[in-house]
A protein has these predicted regions:
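Short hydrophobic "helix-edge" motifs at membrane interfaces and signal-peptide entry regions
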Residues: 94-98, 138, 145
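Hydrophobic alpha-helical transmembrane segments
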Residues: 1-12
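Hydrophobic alpha-helical transmembrane segments and adjacent short intramembrane/lumenal linkers
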Residues: 127-141
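Hydrophobic alpha-helical transmembrane segments of polytopic membrane proteins
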Residues: 141-155
Length: 174
């Protein structure tokens, strides 16, 4: 769980770094172009930038429809659909991070209870409360707690950061 969590964190970190750079380049080229149609025609077919993909989808819809009726409504609908599609791709994996962040401490707590129960069981079997009898169960309990926190803390921090980054990027797209 923790390994996959770190894989998602690294992938999202790289993704946000990439799309922020691409969107800055897109905006600069867009505002320096003579017209939206000229800019659309200059875009490569294999665009990776979500902002460019939203623009491309809206322009394709605009250019394919010759009718000028309800143009504003159609453009709004196409842009909203494009933004939603790109944000769904960007936010993939967020639910996993949130789930790990919220459940890992409970799994660690379960391990803690299990370790404490083992300590009590050792005391009952040996009828002795020396450190040598109690320590293995306590160590097991602390280890389980640490593992739960080790999985949860990075997942929660990453989820919050990426959720904030996602909201900011969504506002840029809109």
């Amino acid at each position: 769980c923790s390994v996959y969590s770190w894989a998602v964190i690294i992938e999202k970190f790289r993704l946000f770094k990439k799309i922020n750079k691409l969107s800055e380049e897109f905006e600069e080229k867009f505002w320096n172009s003579k017209s939206a149609e000229n800019f659309y025609n200059s875009l490569p077919t294999n665009v990776e930038d979500p902002m460019a993909l939203v623009f491309q989808g809206a322009m394709e819809g605009l250019l394919k429809k010759k009718s000028k009726t309800n143009l504003s409504e159609r453009m709004t609908a196409m842009l909203e659909a494009g933004v939603e599609k790109q944000m769904t791709k960007i936010e993939k994996g967020f639910t996993f991070l949130a789930t790990v962040g919220s459940t890992a401490p409970f799994i660690g707590l379960f391990g803690t209870v299990w370790g404490i129960m083992n300590s009590f069981q050792s005391i009952a079997i040996s009828r002795n409360t020396s450190l040598a009898i109690v320590a293995p169960g306590i160590a097991e309990a602390l280890f389980a707690t640490a593992l739960g926190l080790l999985a949860a803390i990075p997942a929660v921090v990453a989820y919050n950061k990426f959720n904030t980054d996602s909201q900011k990027y969504s506002q840029k797209l809109e």
